[in-house]
Amino acid sequence: MGAQVSTQKTGAHETLLEAAQGATINYTNINYYKDAASNSANRQDFSQDPSKFTEPVKDIMIKSMPALNSPSAEECGYSDRVRSITLGNSTITTQESANVVVAYGRWPKYLEDDQATAEDQPTQPDVATCRFYTLESVQWEANSAGWWWKFPEALKDMGLFGQNMYYHYLGRAGYTIHVQCNASKFHQGCLLVVCVPEAEMGCAKPDENVDATNLTNGENTCELTAGAAPAEKGKVQTAVCNATMGVAVGNLTIFPHQWINLRTNNCATIVMPYINSVPMDNMFRHYNFTLMVIPFVPLTSMGGSTYVPITVTIAPMCAEYNGLRLSTQHQGLPVMNVPGSNQFLTSDNFQSPCAMPEYDVTPPLDIPGEVNNLMEVAEVDSVVPVNNLSDNVKTIKAYQIPVSAGDSSRPEAVFKFQLDPGSGSVLKHTLLGEIINYYAHWSGSIKLTFVFCGSAMATGKLLIAYSPPGASAPATRKDAMLGTHIIWDLGLQSSCVLCVPWISQTHYRMVERDEYTTAGYISCWYQTNIIVPPDTPSQCYMLCLASACNDFSVRMLKDTPFIQQEAKLQGEPGKAIESAISRVADTISSGPTNSEQVPALTAAETGHTSQVVPGDTIQTRHVKNYHSRSESTIENFLCRSACVHIARYEAGANASNEDRFVRWEINNKELVQLRRKCEMFTYLRYDVEVTFVITSQQDQGTDLSQDMPVLTHQVMYVPPGGSVTKQGDSYAWQTSTNPSVFWTEGNAPPRMSIPFISIGNAYSSFYDGWSHFSQKGVYGYNTLNKMGTLFVRHVNKETPKPVTSTVRVYFKPKHIRAWIPRPPRLCPYKYKANVNFDVTAITDSRLTITTVPQVEHNLRTA
């Protein structure tokens, strides 16, 4: 029996079945193959929970209440945002906190019985190990680019925690990270404190691999650099603009983070659960996450201390260990007799036979941070490179918006940019821009959060405006205030949100630049001057963060224009609350207000994304929204057949043994479009449907006669560890166990499904660790991603004429689960075996911070 209403959509047509007056709807589900991996993809799953990424805070934050609450203390010039954290026999107190981020909404916990694999009783030292440890301090100066520490490696010499690391084979732990940075009210600057799971880093010399000594220095820090690192063997590419991983540094906010804005707070606190694709791991060779501290606004003071110390204090939580040992050294196929029955459509959704019947897959693991829909990621704030001048696009300065104090009138704009999230140089490489560039159309409201990073003594008012399309960008403040605008009074709440409402004559706008559906302009103006007392920096900075509102949707999936490939990559590698949402949110009618509630003011330092909607800042009408987020589900995003390998093999009297067959170790790293999509998530679990498109040609020669027989091809799948054939006519091809597909030319392309093969609980897109226990061998390589090997040959031993066949292997992941979203790759790929990269500009440049594309609106008469 089914639901009362059943709806099926195909293209622009909709079929509706409704049960009334006691009637029922009966469903028939035909599975032609008994194995779950053979089933077609799951398409209709609308469950979403963006809050684990947008609001991962310990204390519930109410939109209408101030994010930082200290009205009485603000009058005295001091904050009363006190917090005390006790773990073991150690306590930390602070009077300048900005809430606590609980990464992915998960508090650390011990391993559950139904998740465990090791059978020996675990060591759980509790208070002897789970206490605060303080690492070596670093000095923040005006030219500092940033620092990183890798965990648990940074604690290897810290008390009993380090001893247990050495004397146990396996371990796991969560962590409380507390980063402290004390400065006076006359200092200014802003730090991003972020925890990056599986921060696999690239080498400064792309054709080499990094050394362990350059990846981590124990409790001492490793430093980022403002520009590209020297191309030396074993060195990490430390250019801060690409965050050591080939991504835009402004998109690191997809990970658990807080900001230390010296005018607002002096510490950041992040609680990290254990994150991995297996229940436990060797703590010496695998760095589960990396703590990065990056100055987005430089430290500035006038006559005071020229540097400020930054101290990291970290406490393991729920630590447990296993494997005590010696210490280590340092039925038939469906038939459709209709046109199209023998074609291969890369987006089809049919069943295919399973290559491994009765296969017993490993059970899923409860990994924090599961993603169901790309809009969950689009709703997370990321930093916008508003200051993308040519000199800045390869530095952190691209994110710094200068505002300065002055003794005279300031009629000029602070900044302007075109609201073009798909193709505009300012927004296209944010998290929002990267995601919508996988689609042709977008619709919905956009949040822009501005963070003032001047000293606590600086005051002033700014006007931030959205000017709808139809005219040129505003030339004066008078022009700007005619549009949707907000006047921001700088105060304790460091951040102000401009919610750009959806104002359009069409349901969607084009992602590609299009004047008919252009979205308008954003500009900022001095409402009053910025005022500072003596001995206080007069040059201040702002940051801008962008994200989607809950009415945002996309459609018409396509390839992104941000990654290209000319040749195959080389280099071999050695539960949160869910809500079922089928439509985006409606716009609720709102009227004028005069209230002490300030939803537009917030504090980005807390690490949460504001939940402001258009009705909080403008009067709105009720709009019934029928757009859905079905196309942005993870299943739909990844469930398209993509070419992952191309190879040639020959038949004929002159063909050598090596040329008579193809051997390919299955991976998705050679061709960049699918690789980039998969690398937007740290861990993936899926079955894969493999389709083989084989074409043959008769080789050129002096004989002009054509005598091409109908060729039969054999595709053999060998599981990991299976015997490998070295000849095209070996008896290994006459296997009794390895599954083979025999295909004769002229038929529909052969296809098989391969279930989830890994010995772990998920495939790892990145692995910040080593293949050997001694931190030697291959960096970034483990065996969890082994999926087996494919062999292809001609069954015909000889042919009258030399024949060359080309096989194209198409992958379609299905039954997909994804965890821990990541910033999309910015830098071009170099090799398939690592993440090495050349330093790449954050985005395209423009002439000045107020330069916008000029559009002519003259009436054409010709």
UniProtKB/Swiss-Prot annotation:
GO terms for molecular function: structural molecule activity. One of its GO terms (cellular component) is host cell cytoplasm. It comes from the Viruses. Keywords: Autocatalytic cleavage, Capsid protein, Eukaryotic host gene expression shutoff by virus, Eukaryotic host translation shutoff by virus, Host cytoplasm, Host gene expression shutoff by virus, Host-virus interaction, Lipoprotein, Magnesium, Myristate, Pore-mediated penetration of viral genome into host cell, Viral attachment to host cell, Viral penetration into host cytoplasm, Virion, Virus entry into host cell. Gene3D superfamilies: 2.60.120.20, Picornavirus coat protein VP4. Transmembrane segments: none annotated. GO terms for biological process: symbiont genome entry into host cell via pore formation in plasma membrane; symbiont-mediated suppression of host gene expression; virion attachment to host cell. This is Genome polyprotein. Belongs to the picornaviruses polyprotein family. SUPFAM superfamilies: Positive stranded ssRNA viruses. The record marks 69-70, 331-332 as: Cleavage. A lipid is attached at residue 2 (N-myristoyl glycine).
